């Protein structure tokens, strides 16, 4: 729970820097998409805020299982904003010549190697093993491959990585797997999986491992916006960021247990 709260607090700090000067509620319908998982956690309360009248904007929020479902809609202008993996945002910025840009960082390091057993204690113990993972072609794949190489393992020869389209599929595979199954999962899926299986343990915090070999901060998810849309609607952007911050704060309130006085 501490890890989840830290993740949400990080998002509040990053969004609050940008959320100044928001205007009163407008009739603008903001079309926004998100991936199921940590990149979209901060957005989940927008619809309830809209329903109870506390949102500054009207939202059309759609959730998708894979990034390739979002990309064409964003490029075609069928979406205004999206919460996506950081590496994908960089690729889209290049491909669109700056037509899609980062508006906020929404997720820092939330990736973990977990095991249903007690055989893995370091990267060296992963040699010859099969690793279940989500995020092929996105941040989880690149982070895992990078760290394997930095720890002396060839990701194409020394391990076998099996990719699934959604983290929920990985957790299902782990639940059904025999002992010693290994996976890379993001929060909050790690916590959810451990609640269902007490034998599942975290063996490597990939943020800590990243910090050991790299001087830059590990950013896994961002919220992007079409540049043209942002230029034409600065008040909408400011209002959205304010709502975004409120949504995250409400999640922190829910996830943080009540403490006795």
Please tell me what each predicted stretch does.
Residues 7, 73, 128-129, 173, ...:
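Generic alpha-helical secondary-structure signal
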Residues 87-88, 169-251:
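Pocket-lining segment of extracytoplasmic ligand-binding domains
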Residues 11, 111, 221:
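Residue-level detector of short, conserved catalytic/binding motifs and their immediate flanks
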Residues 1-29:
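Short, low-complexity disordered leader/linker segments with a strong preference
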Residues 29, 222, 257:
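A residue-level signal for beta-strand positions that form part of recognition/binding surfaces
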Residues 25-164, 179-187, 203-204:
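Short, glycine-/small- and polar/acidic-enriched structural segments
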Residues 252-261:
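Single conserved hydrophobic/aromatic residue that forms the stacking wall/gate
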């Amino acid at each position: 729970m501490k890890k989840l709260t830290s993740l949400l607090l990080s998002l509040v700090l990053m969004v609050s820097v940008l959320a100044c000067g928001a205007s009163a509620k407008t009739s603008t319908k903001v079309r926004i998409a998100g991936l199921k998982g940590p990149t979209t956690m901060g957005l989940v309360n927008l619809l309830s805020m809209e329903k109870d009248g506390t949102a500054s904007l009207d939202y059309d929020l759609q959730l998708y299982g894979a990034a390739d479902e979002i990309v064409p809609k964003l490029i075609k202008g069928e979406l205004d904003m999206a919460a996506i993996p950081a590496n994908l945002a960089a690729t889209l910025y290049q491909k669109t010549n700056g037509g899609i840009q980062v508006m906020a960082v929404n997720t820092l390091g939330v990736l973990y190697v977990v095991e249903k057993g007690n055989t893995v204690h370091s990267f060296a113990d992963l040699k010859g093993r099969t690793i279940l993972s989500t995020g092929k072609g996105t941040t989880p794949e690149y982070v895992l491959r990078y760290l394997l190489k930095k720890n002396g393992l060839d990701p194409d020869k020394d391990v076998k990585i099996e990719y699934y389209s959604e983290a929920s599929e990985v957790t299902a595979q782990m639940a059904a797997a025999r002992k010693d199954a290994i996976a890379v999962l993001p929060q909050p899926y790690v916590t959810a999986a451990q609640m269902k299986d007490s034998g599942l343990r975290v063996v490597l915090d990939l943020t800590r491992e990243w910090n050991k070999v790299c001087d830059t901060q590990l950013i896994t998810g961002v919220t992007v916006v079409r540049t043209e849309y942002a230029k034409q609607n600065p008040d909408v952007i400011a209002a959205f960021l304010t709502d975004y911050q409120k949504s995250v704060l409400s999640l922190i309130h829910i996830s943080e247990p009540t403490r006795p006085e």
